[in-house]
A protein has these predicted regions:
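A glycine- and small-aliphatic-rich helix-loop capping segment at beta-alpha/alpha-beta transitions
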Residues: 21-26, 112-127, 177-180, 200-213, ...
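Conserved beta-ketoacyl condensing-enzyme motif
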Residues: 7, 20-23, 28-163, 191-200, ...
């Protein structure tokens, strides 16, 4: 028998705050998490700004000995998983059968800082000086592995890697696994820590990043003057749980996950299909599986990267999937305008925003929106959050390689 799936725990480390609730409060306030890059000297770089995590010290959180053996992306993921487990009430030993608890946490690039540091060490000092922890710290599945070890999760584990759609696919695949009875609960999400010279140089070379040095206008999704995304970092982990298991233990339920679409454009390695057929089909699949009724109050947390190609293509995809009237009636926003693009973590933190929006009846804004673009003609909730009577939410994400994901959620009401 198919199971309904609830979100019962949330955890986040983001450019807006080092907890989920701090992040959500900042989203609702329209806070900009973008600022000058402090992780490295940008004198030789065209890109000057990013959305960095602030005030998170791995040495304080894990202790110096353990922190030095954890790449920053894993540190973020572990901290977010701790918060999510506590929020769900799973930090009590017998709260769940650990063989029925899984981990689906991915990363777009894994421990890139660790890899780069060791490449320089090997080049400068020879191969014998490579760290014995290098491989374990750099591989993108290590966030899932370390979370499983930390929380004794012995159920299904799947570290997803689909670039910018990573954690959306992680949430979707976790939803499917629980729906079909393979687990009672899964820690699902993603993490990234790639605001480093090498990643910024690479994204700049493929003309993906904005070179606007003004943090207050650098990230402006759907605006006519948008010119590239802003790198972000952090992690978000959600506890997805079967509804029956959640109700039996009296868990708090933020929202219900009801549908998932997973497609590929099969068009280009980095550019989205301008016809938007792939993302439209992902949305349609999620809507059909969840029996979503857009006329009953719909919020769409769009991928909205602030790139010329993505935002217009995604707008077309939303209209193609839902129809012009339903698309125009929906509340749409891009929280990347505040968090920057958190790459592997972005899908999960946007699903979190959808769940909180449904529970609290608040749509977070798209900040920095000033000049409408005729190719982006939906209601993007410009600059200020709005109250709304919401029943449904969609989170959409697109990744390099043509990967598309859509997650459908429904407001939970106890019957």
């Amino acid at each position: 028998m198919e199971q309904r799936v609830a979100i019962t725990g949330i955890g986040a480390v983001s450019p807006l705050g080092n907890t989920a609730l701090a992040t959500w409060a900042a989203m609702c306030a329209g806070t900009c998490g973008v600022g000058p890059i402090t992780h490295f000297d940008t004198d030789a770089f065209a890109v000057k700004v990013a959305a960095e995590v602030k005030g998170f010290d791995g040495n304080d959180y894990f202790g110096k000995h353990d922190a030095r053996h954890l790449d920053p992306c894993v540190q973020f993921a572990l901290a977010a998983s701790d918060e999510a487990m506590h929020d769900a009430g799973f930090d009590v030993e017998d709260a769940i059968d650990r063989e029925r608890l899984g981990v689906y946490v991915g990363s777009g690039v894994g421990g890139m800082q660790t890899l780069v540091d060791n490449v320089h060490t090997i080049a400068d000092r020879g191969p014998r000086r490579a760290s014995p922890y290098m491989i374990a710290m750099m591989i993108p599945n290590m966030a899932s592995g370390d979370i499983a070890i930390r929380h004794k999760a012995k159920g299904p584990t799947l570290p997803v890697v689909t670039a910018c759609a990573t954690s959306a696919h992680a949430v979707g695949e976790a939803f499917r696994a629980i729906k079909h009875g393979y687990a009672d609960a899964i820690l699902a999400g993603g993490t990234e820590a790639a605001i480093i010279p090498d990643a910024v140089a690479g994204f700049t070379s493929c003309r993906a990043l904005t070179t606007n040095p003004d943090p207050s206008t650098a990230c402006r999704p759907f605006d006519a003057n948008r010119d590239g995304f802003v790198m972000g970092e952090g992690a978000c982990v959600l506890v997805l749980e079967s509804m029956g298991h959640a109700l039996a233990r009296g868990a708090h339920i933020y929202a219900e996950v009801v549908g998932y679409g997973n497609t590929d454009d099969a068009y280009h390695i980095t550019s989205p299909d301008p016809e938007a057929a792939g993302i439209a089909r992902a949305i349609s699949l999620a809507v059909a599986e969840g029996d979503v009724k857009p006329s009953e109050g719909l919020y769409i947390n769009a991928h909205g990267t602030s790139t010329k190609l993505n935002d217009s293509s995604e707008t077309a995809g939303i209209k193609r999937a839902l129809g012009e009237d339903a698309a125009r009636a929906a509340h749409v926003s891009s929280t990347k305008s505040m968090t920057g693009h958190m790459i592997g973590a972005t899908g999960a933190i946007e699903v979190m925003a959808c769940a909180m929006a449904l529970e609290q009846g608040v749509v977070p804004p798209t900040i920095n929106y000033r000049t409408p673009d005729p190719a982006c003609d939906l209601d993007y909730t410009p600059n200020r959050a709005v109250r709304a009577d919401l029943t449904w939410a969609l989170s959409t994400n697109l990744g390099f390689g043509g990967h598309n994901a859509a997650i459908a959620l429904r407001r939970y009401t106890r019957s």
